Design a protein with these regions (language model features):
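A well-structured
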Residues: 1-152
Length: 152
């Protein structure tokens, strides 16, 4: 039976997931319902939530909650769902910490501007107007790959 450290960890995971779900709803609404005049405000809202998401998901408190739950669950089989969750959370924490908050914010803003530019370029059948945004996105994705590391 999971104890209080695991339950506390789950509450943190739920909070992080709730922010991610709110981002998804805001993104969907932006793409489907929102008038163009609200775009800059929506981008700011989404960037703020991405910042909070990154802060929570990379915090020392979250890392400590993971380790406290892991200690509490020590001895469980590796294929137990709780053990698997601990492994995934540890992996995600290490991975998320490789991206600075400034990088996450930049990626969020650039991605949002690129989406708007893509939408306008598609309507105007003008790839050239979207190309600089795409180039910047590719540059950021390459930087992310460098931060994460990879094997050739």
């Amino acid at each position: 039976m999971a104890g209080s450290a695991y339950d506390a960890l789950l509450q943190e995971v739920y909070r992080i997931n709730d922010i991610g779900r709110a981002l998804s709803v805001l993104s969907w609404d932006r793409e489907v319902n929102m008038p163009a005049s609200g775009d800059s405000a929506r981008v700011q809202q989404m960037t703020t939530l991405r910042q909070l998401l990154h802060q929570y998901a990379t915090s020392d408190a979250f890392g400590e909650a993971i380790e406290a739950a892991a200690a509490e669950l020590a001895g469980l089989p590796d294929d137990d769902d709780r053990s698997c969750l601990i492994r995934v959370l540890r992996r995600d924490l290490v991975r998320s910490r490789k991206l600075s908050e400034a990088f996450v914010l930049d990626l969020s803003r650039v991605g949002a501007r690129a989406w708007t530019a893509w939408k306008q370029a598609r309507e105007a059948d003008d790839f050239g107007s979207f190309q600089p945004h795409l180039a910047r996105l590719i540059e950021l994705q390459r930087e992310m790959a460098e931060r994460y590391g990879y094997d050739d």
